[in-house]
Amino acid sequence: DLAPMPDLGSYMSIEAWDPQWEEPALRAANRLNESEWGRPPLTQEQWMQGRTAFAPEWSFVAVDRTGDRPRVAGFLLASRYEQDWAALGWCEGYIDQLGVLSAWRETRVADALILASMWAQKRDGMDRSGTGVGSANHTGVLAVYDSLGFRTVGQTRLYAIEV
């Protein structure tokens, strides 16, 4: 069984993905990419690329309303890769991106985003929820996934050579 949603307090909410959150979520993603990985910011076009399997009904934002304007504290983008289900032997929702800004890392925002997506996937008949996390990820998200019951079912190595 899935864990219940954590209490985030009265000023933090987990909200369904909506086009109004695209730009604030992109800004949050760019802050994370720069601070965590030293990557240049994504353009709107780059942010939208590769979303052929995007499932907005399984995607969420964490919104902090402690100030005079709502701020995105975190986001989760999920997908449905239906072409993989026969090979997997089950129906799976997939968490493609999860980001929580550093000011909210010590809260349960990551847990709440993941659980919101898992509950939505379960409601839609998915058997499992999956994700991929790089071994170099130092944000502590591996412990969050572990605490929610995710288990390593496979590993991938990427190889490259300059040509």
Residue ranges: model-predicted function:
Residues E36-L98:
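A conserved beta-strand-loop-helix scaffold within acyl/acetyltransferase catalytic domains
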Residues T131-L142, L158-V163:
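Conserved beta-strand-loop-alpha-helix junction that forms the acyl-donor binding cleft
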Residues Y145-Q155:
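Conserved acetyl-CoA-binding loop of GNAT-fold acetyltransferases
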Residues D1-M12, T156-E162:
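Acyl-donor-binding surface of acyltransferase catalytic domains
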Residues Q121-G134:
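Conserved GNAT acetyl-CoA-binding A-motif
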Residues M5-P40, D68:
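Short amphipathic alpha-helix that is part of the acyltransferase structural core
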Residues L98-R105, S135:
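A short, internal acetyl-CoA/4′-phosphopantetheine-binding micro-motif in the GNAT/acyltransferase core
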Residues W104, R108-A116:
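Conserved acetyl-CoA pyrophosphate-binding loop and the N-cap/start of the following alpha-helix
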